[in-house]
Amino acid sequence: MTTANTTAKDNAATKKRGRKAKKRVCAFCTDNIDKIDYKDVARLRKYITERGKILPRRITGNCARHQRQLTKAIKRARQIALLPYTVE
């Protein structure tokens, strides 16, 4: 039991001393993109993992509005077979 407590304390200490992560900025806001186009497959692929999952907002740094639009665009592109649902 002491090893579990020690490990938890070490992790907490590392987080306190660790370097603070840089705040990510929404790429769509910086490029002044209002609507995300589902036909822009090259841009959409940046926000999909190698297994075909949509990356979350905390990783991509998108704002809530653009993350919702991005999700809809990816799902729409999957329906018309521009993007795969899963990668084999």
Swiss-Prot record:
Pfam families recorded: Ribosomal_S18
Key words, A-Z: Ribonucleoprotein, Ribosomal protein, RNA-binding, rRNA-binding
One GO MF term: structural constituent of ribosome
Chain spans, region Disordered: 1-21
Taxonomy, superkingdom: Bacteria
Function comment: Binds as a heterodimer with protein bS6 to the central domain of the 16S rRNA, where it helps stabilize the platform of the 30S subunit.
UniProt-listed HAMAP family: Ribosomal_bS18
Subunit field text: Part of the 30S ribosomal subunit. Forms a tight heterodimer with protein bS6.
Stated name of the protein: Small ribosomal subunit protein bS18
Classification of source organism: Bacteria, Bacillati, Bacillota, Clostridia, Thermoanaerobacterales
